[in-house]
Amino acid sequence: MKLAGVELNVQGLDFLDREGKIVPALKDARVRQALNYAIDKDALSKVLGGGKGRPVSTQFLPGSDGYDATLDSYYNYDVAKAKQLLTDAGFANGFELTILSAPFLGFDTLSQAVASYWQAIGVKTTIDSKPSVAEFLTGLSSGKYGGAVAGLGATTPTLITYNCCFKPGSAWNPSKTPVPDLQAIIAKLAATDATQAGPVAKQVNKYITEQALFVPVLATKLYFLYSPKISGVTPTATEASPNILNIVPAQ
């Protein structure tokens, strides 16, 4: 048998409280950056990805116009730097944070692993696991959590990704927190011809990554197992399920 796969998902956490209404520390970008630096993403990608995960520091994957390979390792594991950033932000003694999680898709395992790394820099994390999708989604929009576990790999055009995941009021920004600098780049992107959008889309990725609006941990693939007697099983970022019309007997 043969195996074909394409990266479609980034497992990590989303900061739901970027204004610091529930967890004041999260309003400071240095704190969010510290929480990224505190995680050994190389180790987690090997363990949680079944040996096939890839450590990442960005939500954007190959196939998206905003993908920038140079950002993939932006937050390399650095506990000393994480602690210094917390100190600089006024949280040398850490703080407490509650994360919304769920038992499906390996979310609880990821949450627990991340929490153990955060504990090492003084951040006490409580995991509130919801047993069903409905309860998880209710919690996501409740305004009660500082963050939530997420699976949000962006392979679509950046404008679509923004409207889905970053725009104030979207599912992953339920607090409707405005981000003026990001919105200015988005406005520029919307006014740019699609054939020339790449450089501007990468600016969106750069801003989201540098401001640590998320905690990406690892990228995972969607795999297809198929017989060597056929060919044309070539999933892509824009067409994850192979087109059945392209599947033909192997020559």
PLM-predicted stretches and their roles:
Residues 1-22:
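Extracellular/periplasmic solute-recognition and catalytic clefts
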Residues 9-11, 95, 121, 213:
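Envelope-exposed proteins and targeting segments
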Residues 11, 36-67, 105-115, 138-251:
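Detector for C-terminal structural segments
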Residues 19-31:
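Short helix-loop capping/hinge motifs at secondary-structure junctions, enriched
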Residues 22, 54-88, 106-107:
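Structural transition elements
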Residues 64, 87-101:
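Short, conserved helix/loop micro-motifs enriched in His/Cys and acidic residues
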Residues 102-105, 127-138:
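Short helix-initiation/N-cap motifs at beta->coil->alpha
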